[in-house]
Amino acid sequence: MSKKIGILTSGGDAPGMNSAISFLAKSALSLGFEPYLIFDGYSGIIARKILPAKNFPYNGISSFGGTAIGSSRFPEFKKEEVQNKAVEILSEIGISSLVVVGGDGTYNGGYKLHLKGIKVIALPGTIDNDIQFTDYTIGFDTALNTIVETIDKLRDTANSHRRCFVVEVMGRHCQDLALYSAIATGSEILITNTNILTPEEVSQRVLEQFAKGKPSVIVTITENILPNLKEFAAKIEELTKISTRSLEVGHTQRGGRPSAFDRILAAKMAMKAMELINQDKSGLAISYLDGKIQTFDIAKVVSKPVRKTNDLVLEINKINQN
C-alpha cells in the first residue's frame, strides 16, 4: 500500500473544512502516511495543483472559515476520459488513496475514482445538510448560527416598526437550514419544498399573527422556491397593508469562523477517515448518526441525494407556528 494520501475539498465551501484538512494531515502523519493537498477540488488533480502537506501551514487553519486549499465545481469530471486522466496523474505521483470533503457532487466524483482503483473515503462538507445517512454535515451548524444571528437582528428592527420580514436561506433542495433556523428564531411562517404557500395564504397567516398582538412576523423560506423574493414580499404588503421587507441571507452563510461543533465534528470524521485508510478500506462515506461516527458505502449514500428531515423536528416546527 502506497503511503501517499491525497486530500481535497470540492463543491461549495463550508465552515469546518479547514479543520477537516488539518486533522486529516495530522492524522495521516501520525499513522506514517505522507499527506498531499490537492488545490481547487477535482480540477486541481487535472491541473496538477498538488503539494506535500509538509510544505503548507495546515496546523494553523482550523479556526478559519472557507477552505484553505480552495474548491471548485468541475462538471467536466463527469466525463470518463477526465476521470481516467485523474487516475493517471495520481498514479504518477504515487497517490493511491484520496479523502474528499464536500457534498453529493464530491461524493459522486470520489465514487467514480473508487471504481477505477483509487481508494476513496468521503467526508460530508456542506452547509446544506443534504447528505443521506448523517444527522449533520460539516458546516451546517455554523451556517445555521449565522442565519439565526441574522434573523434575531431582523426581529429587533421588525418589532420596532411592526413589520413583516421575508427571509430566504440556502439549502438547495434540502429544507434543514430553513427549518432549524425557523425553530431557533421562532419564525411564525415557514415555506419549504414540502410546505409551499401562496402569497394569499401567507398574507392570511400574517394578518392572523398581528391580530394575536404580535409586533412582528418572520417568514423563513428555503431557496429555489420563489421566482422573485422582492415581488413576493411586495405582494404580501399589498394584500395585508403591513410593511413587509425581504432579505436574502446569501453567501454569508458559507463564511465565518466555524463553530466549535463543526470543528470537533470535522476532527472526529477526519480521524475516522484515516483509520479506514490505514485498514486499506475504500468506497466509504463518514457520517454522524445517532450520536456516533459511522460509515456507509458511498454508493448507498449517493443513491439517495436528498435527506429526509427528522420527524421530531417537523413536529417541533408545527408548535412554533402557533
UniProtKB/Swiss-Prot annotation:
Q: Catalytic positions? A: D128 (proton acceptor)
Q: Which of this chain's residues are annotated to bind ATP?
A: G12, R73, F74, G103, D104, G105, T106
Q: Which reaction does it catalyse?
A: beta-D-fructose 6-phosphate + ATP = beta-D-fructose 1,6-bisphosphate + ADP + H(+)
| Activity control mechanisms | Allosterically activated by ADP and other diphosphonucleosides, and allosterically inhibited by phosphoenolpyruvate.
- GO biological process annotation, one example: fructose 6-phosphate metabolic process
Q: In which pathway does it act?
A: Carbohydrate degradation; glycolysis; D-glyceraldehyde 3-phosphate and glycerone phosphate from D-glucose: step 3/4
Keywords of this protein's UniProt record, alphabetized? Allosteric enzyme, ATP-binding, Cytoplasm, Glycolysis, Kinase, Magnesium, Metal-binding, Nucleotide-binding, Transferase
For whether the record's keyword set contains Secreted, the answer is no
* Gene3D superfamilies recorded: 3.40.50.450, Phosphofructokinase domain (3.40.50.460)
E.C. numbers:
2.7.1.11
Cellular localization per UniProt: Cytoplasm
UniProt-listed Pfam families: PFK (PF00365)
Q: Which residues bind ADP?
A: R155, G186, S187, E188, K212, K214, P215, S216
UniProt binding sites for Mg(2+)? D104
GO MF term set? 6-phosphofructokinase activity; AMP binding; ATP binding; fructose-6-phosphate binding; identical protein binding; metal ion binding; monosaccharide binding
The cofactor required is:
Mg(2+)
Q: Which residues bind substrate?
A: T126, I127, D128, R163, M170, G171, R172, E223, R245, H251, T252, Q253, R254
PANTHER family recorded for this chain?
A: ATP-DEPENDENT 6-PHOSPHOFRUCTOKINASE, PHOSPHOFRUCTOKINASE
**Entry's family note:** Belongs to the phosphofructokinase type A (PFKA) family. ATP-dependent PFK group I subfamily. Prokaryotic clade 'B1' sub-subfamily.
Protein role: Catalyzes the phosphorylation of D-fructose 6-phosphate to fructose 1,6-bisphosphate by ATP, the first committing step of glycolysis.
> How is the subunit organization of this protein annotated in UniProt?
Homotetramer.
Q: List the HAMAP family.
A: Phosphofructokinase_I_B1 (MF_00339)
Name listed for the protein in its UniProt record: ATP-dependent 6-phosphofructokinase
Query: What species is given as this protein's source?
Result: Mesomycoplasma hyopneumoniae (strain 232)
